[in-house]
């Protein structure tokens, strides 16, 4: 068969395998109590055509079968007319080990260059420090205005529902979304899903949900279901409302028509956007609310002898019956009391919020100590930075234990690792360099990331992961490496802005600009090494899952573009094509490729295996706003640079 590709032809030939493959059985595994796949595997019989020997084997995601130089992979499966069909792929790549060896050599080579640069920097550091000290001795110190940060923690009320203590009910184990959890966790997710708020009207989520359970008529008439958008509200004839009651929405003929149109487009495999997409989300919120009103959502009774079965609802869902279950003997299949207490503690502490508050304190102390003599404030700032990093680490660990997997499978969890990577690298860098700028820019970036993670309307709850992410160590290797790479490059972004800011407002700050430029170089160098290591580990993961280590997926392409952008800057600096200001500007521009890789592919392109399918997301608008703000800042910096171009520090 000939496939035309321009003036050339690509020949596709049929290749006979030296063995036959016969499917004996296909097993689709689901998360407990759901129909969501947790894994799927094929039981096959392999018959060697030369020796006629037959053996049985199993193939599942991330666990390929090797025979006579070939590898068989479980790619996917299909369900049609009530039958399941497995999809296997085959690969033969005798050069794979050579490719992987090349990966290792490239990373090792970059590390050798990094250590060489460090050694060269140490040779000249003594002289530079003496020159800087001489310049500082003739100048008076200036102290910038103090940054005053007002911190307020709002405690949610814990009003009991139906006269029963919520502290008893919140510890009741229930099954939801494929796992067992305390009622406290389910209540928080239900309240957020239905109302769009983590604490509806400031009330304890457990009290809110039990109130709905024990008084369904009042809950159905209360305007608490989030509509989702002003366009959808207008289409439903509810223009002035952000929330409506269950009855208002369930009986709305316009909503029924919109959801029917959305289902029709889904059957035709057409994307749903705008009002149709909002209507689908609203329908999902109504389904969640309906389960609560019908008392089908709280399932605390495991099925004996069947850990995968959906748990049962008590015959009478009353405050007394649920409290009796919570106080009674532990049911087989329930999490241990320690697991329940640990997850409730994680929910109540809210380590994400607490960490960015601690990091804000670190930022304030770092700013106050910037122009002051003595290391006191700097050490305090570093101490709070360690405290914020410790709280982030504790939160990630607790989430890992609750979900029984590394928390690195969705947007929210990736942002956790982004902020954690900033703190981790900053602690290491400050320990090595003792540079107060490290603490300042790390506190800025980590506090901003954790604040956005906490305040943006992102789903923060633990959900089942796709089969390709489960049962493999690559999730715990690839994602942390790539996110720490983004973290280090984000630190470089902050320091580049600080450097250009000094060019604008304090162009004669020779020492500070020089130190910032040097720090920016190290950030870009280390970040680039981590970035290529992340690309390589992702490639190895793809090779073990699908038999190919590069598929030109949009995320793969943009990761490569980002790496090449930073490599161009580093080579241009080494060749003398870029000076300090040019490096700072180039690093800000290069980070736009990181934003495109991290957010653009997921939310703008909305294509590829890494996409979250949100092509009309507000993220698009914010990316444009950020790009315009960056362009304005760079033009301002360029004007200041041209004005003070004679200064050696600015150059």
Please give the residue ranges for each predicted region:
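Solvent-exposed, non-transmembrane regions of integral membrane proteins
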Residues: 1-651
């Amino acid at each position: 068969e000939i496939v035309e590709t321009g003036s050339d032809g690509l020949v596709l030939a049929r290749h006979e395998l030296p063995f036959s493959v016969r499917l004996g059985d296909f097993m689709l595994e689901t998360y407990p109590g759901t129909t969501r796949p947790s894994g799927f595997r094929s039981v096959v019989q392999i018959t060697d055509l030369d020796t006629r020997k037959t053996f049985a084997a199993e193939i599942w995601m991330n666990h390929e079968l090797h025979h006579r130089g070939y590898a068989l992979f479980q790619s996917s499966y299909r369900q049609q007319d009530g039958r399941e069909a497995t999809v296997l792929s085959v690969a033969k790549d005798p050069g794979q080990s050579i490719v992987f060896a090349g990966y290792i050599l490239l990373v090792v080579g970059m590390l050798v260059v990094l250590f060489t640069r460090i050694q060269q920097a140490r040779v000249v550091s003594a002289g530079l420090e003496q020159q800087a000290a001489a310049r500082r001795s003739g100048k008076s110190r200036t102290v910038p205005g103090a940054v005053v940060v007002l911190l307020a923690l709002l405690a949610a009320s814990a009003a009991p529902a139906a006269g029963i203590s919520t502290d008893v009910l919140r510890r009741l184990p229930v099954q939801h979304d494929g796992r067992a959890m305390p009622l406290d966790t389910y209540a928080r997710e239900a309240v957020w899903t239905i109302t769009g708020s983590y604490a509806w009207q400031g009330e304890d989520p457990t009290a809110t949900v039990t109130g709905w359970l024990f008084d369904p008529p009042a809950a159905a008439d209360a305007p608490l279901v989030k509509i989702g958008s002003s366009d959808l509200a207008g289409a439903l004839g509810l223009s002035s409302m952000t929330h409506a009651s269950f009855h208002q929405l369930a009986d709305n003929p316009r909503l029924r028509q919109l959801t029917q149109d959305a289902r029709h487009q889904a059957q035709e495999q057409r994307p749903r956007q705008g009002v149709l997409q909002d209507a689908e989300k609203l329908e999902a919120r109504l389904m969640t609310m309906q389960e609560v009103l019908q008392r089908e959502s709280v399932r605390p009774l495991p099925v004996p002898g069947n850990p995968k079965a959906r748990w049962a609802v008590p015959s009478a869902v009353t405050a007394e019956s649920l409290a009796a279950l919570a106080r009674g003997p532990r049911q087989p299949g329930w999490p241990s009391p320690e697991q329940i207490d640990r997850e409730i503690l994680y929910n109540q502490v809210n380590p994400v919020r607490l960490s960015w508050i601690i990091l804000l304190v670190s930022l304030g102390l770092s700013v106050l100590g910037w122009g002051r003599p003595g290391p006191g404030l700097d050490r305090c700032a570093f101490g709070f930075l360690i405290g914020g990093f410790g709280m982030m680490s504790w939160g990630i660990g607790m989430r890992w234990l609750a979900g029984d997997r590394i928390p690195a499978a969705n947007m929210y969890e990736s942002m956790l690792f982004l902020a954690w990577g900033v703190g981790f690298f900053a602690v290491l860098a400050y320990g090595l360099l003792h540079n107060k700028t490290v603490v300042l820019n790390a506190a800025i970036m980590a506090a901003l990331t954790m604040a956005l993670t906490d305040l943006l309307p992102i789903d923060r709850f633990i959900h089942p992961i796709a089969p390709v992410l489960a049962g493999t160590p690559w999730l715990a290797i690839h994602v942390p490496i790539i996110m720490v790479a983004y973290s280090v490059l984000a630190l470089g972004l902050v320091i580049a802005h600080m450097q250009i800011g000094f060019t604008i407002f304090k162009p004669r700050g020779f020492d500070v600009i020089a130190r910032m430029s040097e720090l920016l170089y190290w950030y870009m160098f280390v970040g680039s090494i981590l970035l290529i290591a992340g690309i390589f580990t992702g490639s190895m993961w793809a090779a073990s899952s699908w038999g190919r280590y590069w598929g030109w997926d949009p995320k793969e392409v943009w990761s490569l573009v980002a790496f090449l952008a930073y490599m161009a800057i580093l080579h241009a600096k080494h060749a003398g094509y870029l000076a300090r200001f040019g490096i700072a500007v180039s690093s800000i521009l290069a980070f736009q490729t990181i934003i495109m890789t991290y957010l653009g592919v997921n939310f703008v392109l909305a294509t590829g295996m890494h996409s979250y399918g949100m092509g009309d997301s507000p993220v698009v608008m914010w990316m444009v706003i950020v790009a315009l703000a960056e362009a304005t800042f760079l033009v301002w910096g360029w004007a200041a640079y041209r004005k003070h171009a004679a200064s050696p520090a600015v150059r």
